[in-house]
Amino acid sequence: MHRLLSLGLCNLLSPSILARVSAMSIIGRRGIHFLHKLNAENVPGALIEHGQSRLIDASLTLIRESAKLRGELVRALGGAVASTSLLGVPLGHNSSFLQGPAFAPPRIREAIWCGSTNSTTEEGKELRDPRVLTDVGDIPVQEIRDCGVEDDRLMNVISESVKLVMEQDPLRPLVLGGDHSISYPVVRAVSEKLGGPVDILHLDAHPDIYDAFEGNVYSHASSFARIMEGGYARRLLQVGIRSINIEGREQGKRFGVEQYEMRTFSRDRHFLENLKLGEGVKGVYISIDVDCLDPAFAPGVSHIEPGGLSFRDVLNILHNLQGDIVAADVVEFNPQRDTVDGMTAMVAAKLVRELAAKISK
């Protein structure tokens, strides 16, 4: 009946109204960014370009000055060889399913400082000490996209922001996603800034190594293909894999990726809990997709995949890792799928806390 009424209504509407309804349906799926693009043809191209450049310059200035202030503080306190600094990248549009990870950075920050826990990590480091953890804020991703900035340029903004943090020695970036597409511009920036490749420890339910998932070279399912193509990593170890198809395995072989699947984790455990990485390269990069964890521990993710790592499995791997960690990210927490008490936010926050302790020295 509803379908018949719908068909009847369509017959009564003019083609122009139907076109507008169709356009609004597309806008609903793609967001306000697409609405701006619909009107862009009525605005001079030079005006759009100038406006985009001004907003990007302002965004980079904010990150630059924030990082400079934190760097000066850490250097004034003295004694730090490496100090973790948070950088938020609230980006979700490259997700193949849900875009909720765009809302994750503020939820993670809130959970880091939640009154239900203290500010000391398991290894005894005090997060309130700026030499252990500072925060330079978020890249205004949505505002940049609302100006019509495409992904090529947006990825460059992310890379440049990471480099601005790294310029303030001894700050090292710990990036809060966002979907997993952010790892590509972050790793690229780290490798370019340090002048060579890194070793990557990647914890995830998925290999994220499609050539171009659904035609999107910047898809969150393709980030590690871009990283390996660019020569930004020497070794890529993927741990926690339990959702992988033929292309994922073939791409892994193509790039020489070391894939450790959950079905063999009991056999691989000793090796993975005693990793030594980064020798002969510029250091170690750690990328943690929250869905590497079993959904019993972290239900607030876009792609729920049972049979994952326990939280203690992940901490054992991190705590025992030997190597100089130069940067890291925590991605794919989706607050829109979290429990009412914010369980996954607390899980993501503890991952950040323990990573901060591991990076800082």
What does each of the following model-derived ranges do?
Residues 33-361:
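Conserved alpha-helical scaffold segments that buttress catalytic/binding sites
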Residues 1-33:
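N-terminal mitochondrial targeting presequence
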